[in-house]
């Protein structure tokens, strides 16, 4: 069995759980933040929706320099818009995940910012830590934001 065959079911569950969470994000609470140093909901929710695109970068490139990346955060409009962004990114990432050969998981992957190393390790570790664990972390934050705004928190 290929490594990607082991990872695809987990990817599918995490994307489903993320979709369920994003579906409940209230459009009228974009400015809400539980603490002055916390991201407002209108920035956190789009960040979560766009994270699969980061997974795609990890799976298909040897490195990313944030200073050279042409990243534009999506504006927060609605839960439906966030779900659409998530699903588009997840579909591309799933396709790349299904296609990646086993030996590519051991390839080195780097994340830098203006020449300064942020991450330097295996593609597998980058995928796991910087994409999958990252989306779970921020999805949990969204759950707290939902609870604090009397929204239903999905049972995931």
Predicted regions and their residues:
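Secondary-structure boundary/capping positions in well-ordered alpha/beta enzyme cores
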Residues: 28-29, 103
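Basic/polar N-terminal segments that are highly enriched at the extreme N-terminus
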Residues: 1-9
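Short, conserved clusters of charged catalytic residues that mark active-site
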Residues: 2, 77, 88, 127-130
